[in-house]
């Protein structure tokens, strides 16, 4: 289970939590402009926009969980088990396997508007990367500073939805998630007024009672509501550091703590990492479950005209600053 969100101050920020019971060996990976991309449908991109994000590198190929490109377009794939249905290959150059969907979009598109045009002619297939890495059932959040969309592949085709909430979790399908926000329209960050029975002497006995009823469990539908509420009401300074800090606080509202979500006896889902893409600066910030310090990789400190990946292992040991 995962949660992704967008946030805008003077800059545009995009990121996600990756929640799972184990890691595949994730790395922060810069894909420079001349890293050759060959897609299973036959298309090839010898040159393209540079990418930066978190990925599992298999046989030299970065399988991105989330990333941004040098133009500020961002994308993340989240579990959509039981609802994702991919098409069969048609034998054309626009056949794109699920695992290569993110670089297919980010390598070519500078904006959500351009991505919409590309998606209209893309046939998203369930072709696996390998026998050891079958096709993951995903849906995607895709955003730039001006637009945010959700992309879902279902039995009746590829759907592109406007996403005014700026968040995404997992099941159910996005239209149902968005509709469910209607149930919480009375919630507020402000203290409530007594509209229950003005004749009764009802008083707020605690701060935060305006949001009484906000879901607090770890299910994907509850995390969607909680993330949407937190994002919509978050107040931040305008600077880069203030914005990045606030973004991590927003996603902190849906973090998974070891022991609270048991997937089988002795195995628990945790927030393996949380990311924040500063889309206009090309900086990928992240924290890990074991290291709460915000770390960063700046794509512009790498050679973006190179042909080889630049790979950075995430810092996973707690980094505590002693003041005496």
What are these regions (language model features)?
Residues 1-94, 121, 126, 311, ...:
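A contiguous strand-loop segment
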Residues 92-128, 240-249:
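Proteins synthesized as precursors that undergo proteolytic processing into mature forms
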Residues 121-159:
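Catalytic cofactor-binding cores of redox enzymes
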Residues 8-11, 69-71, 143-147, 152-157, ...:
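Short acidic-glycine loop/turn motifs at beta-strand connectors
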Residues 1-13, 127-129, 135-136, 144-145, ...:
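C-terminus-biased signal that marks the final domain/tail of proteins
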Residues 15, 76-77, 151-152, 285-287:
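Beta-strand residues in well-ordered beta-sheet regions across diverse protein folds
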Residues 20-22, 81-83, 156-159, 166, ...:
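Short, surface-exposed beta-strand-loop junctions and turns on beta-sheet-rich folds
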